[in-house]
Regions:
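His/Asp/Glu-enriched, well-ordered alpha-helical/loop segment
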Residues: 280-363
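Metal-associated gating/positioning segment near the N- to mid-region
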Residues: 63-134
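Histidine-rich, glycine-flanked metal-binding segment
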Residues: 20-23, 30-76
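Divalent metal-dependent hydrolysis catalytic cores, especially in the metallo-beta-lactamase
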Residues: 101-129, 136-155, 177-192, 208-212, ...
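Sec/Tat signal peptide C-region and signal peptidase I cleavage site
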Residues: 14-18
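Bacterial N-terminal signal peptides
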Residues: 3-13
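C-terminal cap of metal-dependent C-N hydrolases
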Residues: 28, 353-407
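Active-site core of metal-dependent hydrolases
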Residues: 183-305
């Protein structure tokens, strides 16, 4: 009798157990640098959050089970340098045709979070939020430009107007959008001074935010001086591998001031872009142990159609230079999430939002180019297989979550 009752109990328990999770990803290799996980684990999702991380979770414990054997499961990738304020302005990143939509360039590439890097200043930010940020499936944050007009023309004329740095107006917009604005951006300042950087730092101090600096390619002021005397701990210097900034010492190793800046907490971001990544700097810096703090794309029309392509491709370049895979993942998830003040992102932890990238690492002979046509050969390439945003599968390259159409009893609509 007891055996019969036990069998009845177990039979009744199975349906409840099967509904415990919405989705379980099984047999993947989890890389979560923040929580020191680098091992095969099963990951379960319920109600948009990570619900369990175990060596083994039964397939019938979830409404849907997906086998990702041979693949890597990482936090959703975080790209902190993009330009996505699309609009009708000609030759403009801010509300213009040089920006690209976030979702088509983020979601198919394992990216769940982006930060627009100063496309908008305070004047256009309400429109930017209403039309772009609030209507993207990708999670979007923003660095707001110190220039009120933002990046409104390709020749950077607007960004030279020191009279368009209204800290009161800027701070008002930041206060109204503090859930979205994660920092201040200054870029392309061509004058022989650091007015824009100093104003951005002043705004950062006033609003308790970091500054992202695009130093440019100008020889009329000292990058070393800016890094040593103006930037604060937590501030971000993007385009770290763009020449001709003097990052290397006479011995071909990272300059001492770069090492000192890192010790002080200055962050160095890739910001690949269409013209801001050279192997002539990246290789000697990386070979001598100076890895970037964060890997980002500087996504825009020119970079997406050039040698940058997408974030996994930039990650693959850093991998080809000798940075270990786990560190490349750290620089694409945990580190950038922390740099923008959202350390809760960029991790695989029970209770955290289920933003996940499932990645394949192909092995073979691959070539990677920089902006000058320089090439580095690599033996690995990172390929996105799945993207999960807040528990929902939003990209599935090989249809792992689909069913054979003849067997699925699918309802095909007709018109």
């Amino acid at each position: 009798m007891l055996r019969i009752l036990a069998a009845i109990f177990l039979a009744c328990a199975i349906p409840a157990h099967a509904q415990q999770y919405d989705l379980v990803l099984r047999n993947g290799h989890v890389i979560d640098p923040k929580n020191n996980i680098d091992a095969q684990r099963d990951v379960a999702i319920r109600d948009g959050k990570i619900a369990a991380i175990e060596p083994s979770i039964p397939a019938n414990a979830a409404k849907q089970s997906v086998d990702i054997s041979g693949l890597y499961l990482t936090p959703g990738l975080v790209d902190i340098h993009v330009h996505i304020f699309t609009g009708l302005r000609h030759n403009a990143w801010g509300n213009g045709d040089l920006s690209v939509p976030a979702d088509p360039f983020a979601i198919p590439n394992g990216v769940t979070t982006v930060a627009d890097a100063g496309s908008s200043g305070w004047r256009d930010f309400p429109e930017f939020r209403r039309r772009i940020i609030d209507n993207s499936r990708t999670r979007v944050f923003a660095f707001i430009n110190i220039i009120g007009s933002g990046m409104v023309n390709e020749d950077d004329v607007a960004e030279q107007n020191e009279h368009d740095m209204d800290l009161d107006a800027l701070s008002k917009i930041i206060e109204q959008n503090k859930d979205i604005i994660v920092g201040i951006k200054t870029a392309h300042w061509q004058q022989p001074n650091f007015i824009s950087v100093k104003k951005a730092v002043e705004a950062g101090n006033r609003n308790h935010l970091p500054v992202m600096v695009d130093f440019g390619w100008f020889d009329n002021k000292s990058y070393k001086e800016m890094v040593e005397t103006i930037l604060r701990p937590g501030d971000i210097s993007t385009h770290v591998f763009r020449m001709p900034a003097p990052l290397l010492g006479p011995d071909g190793k990272p300059a001492p001031y770069m090492l000192d800046a890192r010790k002080r907490g200055i962050k160095f971001d890739v910001g690949h872009g269409g013209g801001s990544f050279t192997f002539a700097l990246a290789e000697p810096m990386v070979k001598n142990g100076f890895f970037p703090d964060s890997i980002s794309t500087d996504l825009h029309v020119g970079s997406a159609t050039g040698v940058m392509l997408n974030l996994p491709n930039v990650m693959s370049k850093i991998l080809a230079l000798g940075v270990p895979l786990a560190e490349v993942i750290r620089e694409s998830t945990t580190n950038p999430a922390t740099e923008i003040g959202h350390p809760e992102l960029g991790q695989i932890a029970v209770g955290s939002v289920a933003d996940i990238a499932v990645l394949r690492v192909d092995h073979g002979n691959f070539g990677y180019a920089d902006l000058a046509g320089g090439k580095v050969n690599g033996t690995e390439r990172i390929v996105p297989e799945m993207t999960i945003r807040a528990g929902r599968v939003v990209f599935d390259l090989n249809a792992r979550t689909a069913v054979p159409w003849r067997e699925g009893h699918l309802k095909y609509a007709t018109r």
